[in-house]
Amino acid sequence: MNHSLASFEGGDALGFGNTNWLTLTYENDYFYITAGKEDIKVGSFEYDTYDLDSYWEMNSLFWNNCSPWQWGLSAGWYPTDGQTLILQCTNSPYSTYEVFNLFAYALAWRGEWDHYESYWSTNLWQNTKGEYVKSLNLGNRFYAGDFRFDLEYSTRTIEWSD
């Protein structure tokens, strides 16, 4: 796997290091609740791409070095057709065997229209006890016929004043 922090360097305490998705989901017309191992909700179409569908040399440093597959809970609400508001709490991608009880939190919004798709999020990833990496991610995808164009903005910091 290309992600150097992927489930503790290829393994995890439960023995599911090579498993990307293992979830149990309840869904109805208005919301869903998911528990298990899934992708961290980062508002980026690049980061949302599955490993085998990505070309290592063309990916960002963030994609290549931060594991998207973590254990946790997520809940989504469908306010209107084609839109989802998501809350998520997972293990932090900075967790290791030595420092395990670190968590990541996400608030994400996905929207789909005829020629435009959005995937925006704000995230907190705990990197040590009491310290968080904060991020704002704005993924925008535009469609014109068979052509697809992604325009994304991501910023991450320890201090908001940076």
What residues fall within each predicted segment?
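Detector for outer-membrane/organellar transmembrane beta-barrel domains
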Residues: 107-162
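Surface-exposed coil loops of outer-membrane beta-barrel proteins
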Residues: 4-21, 30-110, 120-124
